[in-house]
Amino acid sequence: SQQTVLHTMSTKAFSLEIGKLMNVGTRDLEILYYGSLLHDIGKIVIPLSILEAPRRLTDEEMRIMKAHVVITGKILEGIMDERIVNVAYRHHEKLEGTGYPQGLRAEDLSLLERIVAVGDILSALYSKRSYKDSFPPEKIKGILKDDADNGKISKEIVDVVLKKFDDIISRYEKQRNLTME
């Protein structure tokens, strides 16, 4: 769907900005690039009626939607570098073990996997979706801070995002406007 493409592009842009701000190396930026670009490729098999539902998903629809990460892993496994596969496959994992699909914990997740998890959330909050408008900056910052304080996502990464929030958004908007012209 067009929404998924826009979300993918913003997740990629946010993840790369965060990676640069955290001084990850060139090879790690490449892994971030491909992992974030491919993180939702499994959504190609999710029905549009679920992807673009103008309401909260039912439990069954959410179960189907969550399958996209497993499908992503299956599509990429064996054809992409294992680190890229893991970045894409693990973007819904949470540091305290409540994420999916594996319920991994902090010690199981690399810095790059954590960066894309934050980039994905930032994109979801910043972007307009079929079921919601984009959130204002202060609400986005509050949600990210709460998730970090509750041990779901990396406090270190969120601190970088909060400190450089306006720059991250500004760079994304400039890039998006150039792409849309």
Regions found by a protein language model. Name each.
Residues 1-181:
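Histidine- and acidic-residue-rich, metal-dependent catalytic cores
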